């Protein structure tokens, strides 16, 4: 049996700032606010005969691209049953409980998730990471999303 290694990538630079609001119900949501989100990863792979399991640099670069692509945007969910989003003249019109908020389309990301939470972001960003990075001989890839010190969620992929 080959030896397994678990790599942890938790770099200070893997952060992005974004605005959002969480939707709690048909009539309740948070006020618009922002977070300095952090991304980190846990990678499990078999060690090769050279004592090497996975290239940190591949995953560090991929995590940085995810951060860069989401930095300084308003994040809106496109699949919420309680938020209707329409596009009109360079703006997203986000209607919740009878109130419409306007966001410039070039400063807003419409994400394929039901709510902008660390849980939903973890799954969404893990899928993007898996599309971009070569999974190679990885056995597990877990992506962590934090929205502040001491609070985070993760999503995990395991090889079949």
List each model region and its residues.
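Charge-rich, low-complexity N-terminal segments
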Residues: 1-160
């Amino acid at each position: 049996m080959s030896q397994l290694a678990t790599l942890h990538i938790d770099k200070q630079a893997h952060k992005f700032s974004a605005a959002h609001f969480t939707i709690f119900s048909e009539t309740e949501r948070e006020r618009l606010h922002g977070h300095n989100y952090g991304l980190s990863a846990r990678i499990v792979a078999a060690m090769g005969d050279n004592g090497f399991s996975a290239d940190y640099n591949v995953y560090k670069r991929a995590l940085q691209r995810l951060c860069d692509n989401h930095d300084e945007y308003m994040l809106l969910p496109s699949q919420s049953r309680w938020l209707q989003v329409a596009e009109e003249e360079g703006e997203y019109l986000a209607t919740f409980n009878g109130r419409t908020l306007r966001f410039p389309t070039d400063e807003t990301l419409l994400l394929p998730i039901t709510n902008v939470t660390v849980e939903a972001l973890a799954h969404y960003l893990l899928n993007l990471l898996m599309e971009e990075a070569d999974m190679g001989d990885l056995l597990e890839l877990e992506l962590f999303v934090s929205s502040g010190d001491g609070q985070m969620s993760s999503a995990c992929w395991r090889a079949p």
